């Protein structure tokens, strides 16, 4: 079962920040500078957390992963000023 996650991070080093930014594109949709919306099952969240752990400096950096619950039941109530907020919808993936 997929859950909807919001991932936010504060990375002190520009090189690590760029690396994490590129990595996160493989797991979700970019919302703002250091914020991603991700729709992940159990295996993908474990893979994402492992990838994050390899990049961050645990003494300097901070990553928050907010689990909003089962993706099919979550209807985020988001106020957006400026660019429209578009939640991730369930889509078929062709491999």
From Swiss-Prot:
It comes from the Bacteria. One of its GO terms (molecular function) is metal ion binding. Mg(2+) binds at residue 10. Its EC number is 3.1.-.-. InterPro entries: CRISPR_associated_Cas2, Virulence_VapD/CRISPR_Cas2. The keyword Acyltransferase does not apply. Its cofactor is Mg(2+). The keyword Transmembrane does not apply. Keywords: Antiviral defense, Endonuclease, Hydrolase, Magnesium, Metal-binding, Nuclease. GO terms for biological process: defense response to virus; maintenance of CRISPR repeat elements. It holds the Pfam family CRISPR_Cas2. CRISPR (clustered regularly interspaced short palindromic repeat), is an adaptive immune system that provides protection against mobile genetic elements (viruses, transposable elements and conjugative plasmids). CRISPR clusters contain sequences complementary to antecedent mobile elements and target invading nucleic acids. CRISPR clusters are transcribed and processed into CRISPR RNA (crRNA). Functions as a ssRNA-specific endoribonuclease. Involved in the integration of spacer DNA into the CRISPR cassette. Homodimer, forms a heterotetramer with a Cas1 homodimer. HAMAP family: Cas2. Belongs to the CRISPR-associated endoribonuclease Cas2 protein family. This is CRISPR-associated endoribonuclease Cas2. The gene is cas2.
């Amino acid at each position: 079962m997929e859950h909807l996650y919001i991932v936010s991070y504060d990375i002190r080093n520009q090189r690590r920040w760029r690396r994490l930014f590129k990595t996160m594109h493989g797991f979700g949709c970019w919302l703002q500078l250091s914020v991603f919306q991700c729709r992940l099952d159990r295996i993908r969240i474990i893979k994402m957390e492992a990838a994050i752990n390899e990049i961050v400096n645990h003494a300097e950096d901070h990553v928050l992963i907010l689990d909003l619950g089962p993706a099919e039941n979550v209807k985020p109530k988001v106020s957006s000023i400026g660019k429209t907020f578009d939640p991730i919808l369930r889509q078929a993936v062709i491999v």
